[in-house]
């Protein structure tokens, strides 16, 4: 994991479809919040940034009790913007490879480490899966297995899985 110097967790959304009136990153599985699980996976990364918006004070409180050095980036427009906007706020000025993680992603440690280890630092690595949801961020892949587009409108065979390792590209 040494080539990755920064991590961004996008946790600004309202999680409205769940209907629980709480950020999805604060949901507990086996007694541990998703954000706590993610911070454990990212413990060796020195610069962790979390984008907050909805109920951000609750997220900050939980995160600070786990890791005090996390940088919080506020998305004041979380109700009207996409995950991409949140990511663009947190990645401004990053000059080294970084990992992006959706705040609602619960990932197996072994799978996470395999994903990180497969990142060479030269080419971006984007986690995709076969499309299976109705409200997916669909991913278009070219004939060389490179991601060429993300969108919510045009269904495709693949969807964004919520994780990516990027090398000095601009997200806007």
Features from the language model and the residues they span:
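Residues at the starts of beta-strands that form the adenosine-phosphate
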Residues: 6, 46-48, 69, 97, ...
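N-terminal glycine-rich phosphate-binding loop and ensuing alpha1 helix
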Residues: 2-59
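Short phosphate-binding loop-to-helix
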Residues: 61, 65-98
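Residue-level signal for inorganic ion chemistry
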Residues: 35, 59, 104, 139, ...
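Conserved beta-strand segments of alpha/beta enzyme cores
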Residues: 25, 47, 69-71, 146
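Conserved core of the sugar-phosphate nucleotidyltransferase
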Residues: 108-172
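Short beta-strand-to-loop acidic/aromatic patch adjacent to the donor-nucleotide binding site
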Residues: 96-106
């Amino acid at each position: 994991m040494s080539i990755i110097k920064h991590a961004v967790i996008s946790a600004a959304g309202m999680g409205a479809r769940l209907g629980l009136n709480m950020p999805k990153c604060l949901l507990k599985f086996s007694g541990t919040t998703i954000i706590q699980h993610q911070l454990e996976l990212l413990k060796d990364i020195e610069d962790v940034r979390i984008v907050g918006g909805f109920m951000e004070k609750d997220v900050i409180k939980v995160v600070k009790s786990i890791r005090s050095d996390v940088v919080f980036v506020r998305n004041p427009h979380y109700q009207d913007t996409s995950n991409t906007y949140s990511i663009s706020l947190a990645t401004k000025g990053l000059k080294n490879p970084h990992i992006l993680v959706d705040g609602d992603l619960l990932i197996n440690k072994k799978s996470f480490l395999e994903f990180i280890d497969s990142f060479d630092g030269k080419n971006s690595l984007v986690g995709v899966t076969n499309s299976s949801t109705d409200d997916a961020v669909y991913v278009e892949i070219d004939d060389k297995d490179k991601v060429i587009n993300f969108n919510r409108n045009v269904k495709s065979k693949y969807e964004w899985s919520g994780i990516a390792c990027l090398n000095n590209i601009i997200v806007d």
